[in-house]
From Swiss-Prot:
It comes from Escherichia coli O157:H7. Binds 1 zinc ion per subunit. This is Isoleucine--tRNA ligase. L-isoleucyl-5'-AMP binds at residue 561. GO terms for cellular component: cytosol.
Length: 938
């Protein structure tokens, strides 16, 4: 028997079946770096319209986690897709380098700055530590396949950036937004310094828990509110607290606007309590005989005044969202100098931020005769005795509760108001302008707008000063007597900024005031405060975007971060940009959800459900991680687990196999000389290119809308359904058995070529490594990298006016689906083995019959059977299968007649009819020794 294998056009490619991504990707990365791929892209895109995605800087501390990966991959997908859409989209990654976590790391190793270890040395160590952290994170970000200017990132600790941060503050001061005030901060009396949240630990502590009566100033007004006239004794509003020592600083009582408050008659007096807490308070204070005289909503009591039990002044009732019914009385003692909630509500009502406590934790002189000079924790008993003496104490008991302590000394800390600098929300209309700017920004998802609007509408002034060592100095001089800013502040700040640009922030601490103030130096002091790190990152629109040459003076188009950044970077950037320039720093803001495990639980080391991006890249490869990110709806929580990643790997295989099929069947195809003109192509091939065109329209629309899971779904549908289960199946016969250089085969290869050119580009933003690999195997002249080009423009489709248009092939797909069902059943019943052992008769209504007969003998190729006949629907035998999808179709199957051709595997009556080729069918003889078969339709 002759061997006809050599006469077949079998698929052949060097593109491997297995991705082996974990092994191959590092080599590709090395090539990208050696070639300076990022630089090549910039050169290719020069002069095109820009799209600037400004990188929100991650903090330079610790290894990257899965959330970082999601963030950087989403950014990279956008930047690459914008490049393919014809934009110049430079990406400059950044890092946030100042602040407390870095200070703590340095402190753990070297101790706090003191005489032996100077503040200058401390800062140098912080700078060194941050640089090593940046290097570690940069390696991992690059490994993700993220393209950017990794050799020239922006760091908030770059000297030039530090100088520009000072300039940003200068502009805000020039525009009149800065003011000085007091704000409560965590304060350790042993450190004699403010603590950040990260330096606070919680331990159990026993404190006195007290209920205190504040007597109403206008008793009649209260009776009127409750609609009662007969009350026995004075009326008081009752507060509950576990910090009696803060009562000297009380300036109000907070109640909830929507709670019901009851006026309760007890022995000799009446008290006001939240109605839902009356029973528990009565039990606590040991009263069994009481009567509720009336109730009102909290809002009714707003601004009524109550006498402080011992300080000799009265205070208002105010409305606050922080009031709860979890414990206490429903009325909260409010001391703006001693608590963050109290401070925020105090700002709203214009209350004094009183702070009667010194840095050592003792009361300042003039606070109260029996309290002056007393340590606050020793003062609790004195205050309780004082309340008892004044008849204001309803109840006292000891209570154990969780209390904030200093992480160094393990001793209890206090909240204490200290002088700070603020960006005012209202003195120059910053709040109103910010709210206006928010409306001009596109928020993705759109609920982001309402979220940031409510935050801006309700936020207090922004405290931008910090008492830290490692941070950008505020660079201010204040008069030592009046504490007023120097009249030439803006000029002086520019002078400092110039020095910082050369020597970094240390230049400020090394600066002798005389150098720039001359004779005035004796009258002024340098402000020792540093800026809140949120000011560093929030001013990058000015300190980085406005000055980097690749951004060419354009503002950022997009900020993209996790949903926690509405109150973080999106907010600080909006405040600073609006305060400096009167406008938002971004046109679009996209937020993604947090990562959770497969069961929707938050990731935590203690549960052991974290997924390390490094592990995923080392086992599965970065492209699998990228595909998982793209295929997950980022608008909500993003679930990730081994099982979910395995599903991503399965999808990846489907896409890779499709690409490999295309490449293997483009073997021997040179687009410059083998391409068939559209009008000469087989109709089915034009349909397939049209499918790619339709898919491309959907995919580009989805990229444009940042709907990446839609991109992946459409890509999968194209690979699996339109190509895999229909077109690629049908063309194997023609591709393998037709004459190598025949129009029938070259038409098919032309379609595959167009499809591959489009597919590789659709993949590129998401499956960057695989797209680069595919690109290297595609035939024809091309640029070195897929990333320098644009979406493929060579696609075309069938015209609606043609008889065999898209609707025709859609119907044929359905017919084929129905035939497949019948074949599957016959295989299950052992009537046939493969589909080529079958011949089918399609009994149809006239309209469908006309379409099917138009294909002539080529119908069998579409159905993958050896025979296909069309007959009248009414002639169908009883055993013909009625289609559930197409009402006018019944399918009957029989075993194909004739012999199996060993070359094409079809069963035909003409095997062996040509003496020279006695083993193969007539069609194969024509393809091997004649002019080759002609195909018009399929």
């Amino acid at each position: 028997m002759s061997d006809y294998k050599s006469t077949l056009n079998l698929p052949e490619t060097g593109f491997p079946m297995r991705g082996d991504l974990a092994k191959r990707e590092p080599g590709m990365l090395a090539r990208w770096t050696d070639d300076d791929l990022y630089g090549i892209i910039r050169a290719a895109k020069k002069g095109k319209k820009t799209f600037i995605l400004h990188d929100g800087p991650p903090y330079a501390n610790g290894s990257i986690h899965i959330g970082h990966s999601v963030n950087k991959i989403l950014k990279d997908i956008i930047v690459k897709s914008k490049g393919l859409s014809g934009y110049d989209s430079p990406y400059v990654p950044g890092w946030d380098c100042h602040g407390l976590p870095i200070e703590l790391k340095v402190e753990q190793e070297y101790g706090k700055p003191d005489e032996k270890f100077t503040a200058a040395e401390f800062r140098a160590k912080c700078r060194e530590y941050a640089a090593t952290q940046v290097d570690g994170q940069r390696k991992d970000f690059i490994r993700l396949g993220v393209l950017g200017d990794w050799s020239h990132p922006y760091l908030t600790m770059d000297f030039k950036t530090e100088a520009n941060i000072i300039r940003a503050l200068g502009k805000i001061i020039g525009n009149g937004h800065l003011h000085k005030g007091a704000k409560p901060v965590h304060w350790c009396v042993d450190c004699r310094s403010a603590l950040a949240e990260a330096e606070v630990e919680y331990y159990d502590k026993t404190s006195p828990s007290i209920d205190v009566a504040f007597q109403a100033v206008d008793q009649d007004a209260l009776k009127a509110k409750f609609g009662v006239s007969n009350v026995n004794g004075p009326i008081s509003l009752v507060i509950w607290t576990t910090t009696p020592w803060t009562l000297p600083a009380n300036r109000a009582i907070s109640i909830a606007p929507d709670f019901d408050y009851a006026l309760v008659q007890i022995d000799g007096q009446a008290v006001i309590l939240a109605k839902d807490l009356v029973e528990s308070v009565m039990q606590r204070i040991g009263v069994t005989d009481y009567t509720i005289l009336g109730t009102v909503k909290g809002a009714e009591l707003e601004l009524l005044r109550f006498a402080h039990p011992f300080m000799g002044f009265d205070v208002p009732a105010i409305l606050g969202d922080h009031v709860t019914l979890d414990a206490g009385t429903g009325a909260v003692h409010t001391a703006p100098g001693h608590g963050p909630d109290d401070y925020v509500i105090g700002q709203k009502y214009g209350l004094e931020t009183a702070n009667p406590v010194g840095p050592d934790g003792t009361y300042l002189p003039g606070t109260y005769p029996t309290l002056d000079g007393v340590n606050v924790f020793k003062a609790n008993d004195i205050v309780v005795a004082l309340l008892q003496e004044k008849g204001a104490l309803l109840h006292v008991e000891k209570m154990q509760h969780s209390y904030p302590c200093c992480w160094r000394h393990k001793t209890p800390i206090i909240f204490r108001a200290t002088p700070q600098w603020f960006v005012s929300m209202d003195q120059k209309g910053l709040r109103a302008q910010s709210l206006k700017e928010i409306k001009g920004v596109q928020w993705i998802p759109d609920w982001g707008q309402a979220r940031i609007e409510s935050m801006v509408a309700n936020r207090p002034d922004w405290c931008i000063s910090r008492q830290r060592t490692w941070g950008v100095p505020m660079s201010l001089f204040v008069h030592k007597d009046t504490e007023e800013l120097h009249p030439r502040t803006l000029e002086l700040m520019e002078e400092v900024a110039k020095r910082v640009e050369v020597d970094g922030i240390q230049a400020w601490w090394d600066l002798d005031a005389k150098e720039i103030l001359g004779d005035e130096a004796d009258q002024y002091v340098k402000v020792p405060d540093t800026l809140d790190v949120w000011f560093d990152s929030g001013s990058t629109h000015s300190s980085v975007v406005d000055v980097r040459p690749e951004f060419a003076g354009h503002a950022a188009d997009m900020y993209l971060e996790g949903s926690d950044q509405h109150r973080g970077w999106f907010m600080s950037s909006l405040m600073i940009s609006t305060a400096m320039k009167g406008k938002a720093p971004y046109r679009q803001v996209l937020t993604h959800g947090f990562t959770v495990d497969g069961q929707g639980r938050k990731m935590s080391k203690s549960i052991g459900n974290t997924v390390s991006p490094q592990d995923v890249m080392n086992k599965l490869g970065a492209d699998i991680l990228r595909l998982w990110v793209a295929s997950t709806d980022y608008t909500g929580e993003m679930a990730v687990s081994d099982e979910i990643l395995k599903r991503a790997a399965d999808s990846y295989r489907r896409i890779r196999n499709t690409a490999r099929f295309l490449l293997a069947n483009l073997n021997g195809f040179d687009p410059a000389k083998d391409m068939v003109k559209p009008e000469e192509m087989v109709v089915l091939d034009r349909w397939a290119v049209g499918c790619a065109k339709a898919a491309q329209e959907d995919i580009l629309k989805a990229y444009e809308a940042y709907d990446f899971h839609e991109v992946v779904q459409r890509l999968m549908r194209f690979c699996s359904v339109e190509m895999g289960s229909f077109y690629l199946d049908i063309i194997k016969d023609r591709q393998y058995t037709a004459k190598a250089d025949s129009v029938a085969r070259r038409s098919c290869q032309t379609a595959l070529y167009h499809i591959a050119e489009a597919l590789v580009r659709w993949m590129a933003p998401i499956l960057s490594f695989t797209a680069d690999e595919v690109w290297g195997y595609l035939p024809g002249e091309r640029e070195k990298y897929v990333f320098t080009g644009e979406w493929y423009e060579g696609l075309f489709g069938l015209a609606d006016s043609e008889a065999m248009n898209d609707a025709f092939w859609d119907e044929l797909l359905k017919v084929r689906g129905e035939v497949n069902k019948v074949i599957e059943q016959a295989r299950a019943d052992k009537k046939v083995g493969g589909s080529l052992e079958a011949a089918v008769t399609l009994y149809t209504e006239p309209e469908l019959a006309a379409k099917l007969t138009a294909l002539g003998d080529e119908l069998r190729f579409v159905l993958l059977t050896s025979g296909a006949t069309v007959a009248d629907y009414n002639d169908a035998p009883a055993d013909a299968q009625q289609s559930e999808v197409l009402k006018g179709l019944k399918v009957a199957l029989s075993k194909a007649e004739g012999e199996k051709c060993p070359r094409c595997w079809h069963y035909t009556q003409d095997v062996g009819k040509v003496a020279e080729h006695a083993e193969i069918c007539g069609r194969c003889v024509s393809n091997v020794a004649g002019d080759g078969e002609k195909r018009k339709f399929a």
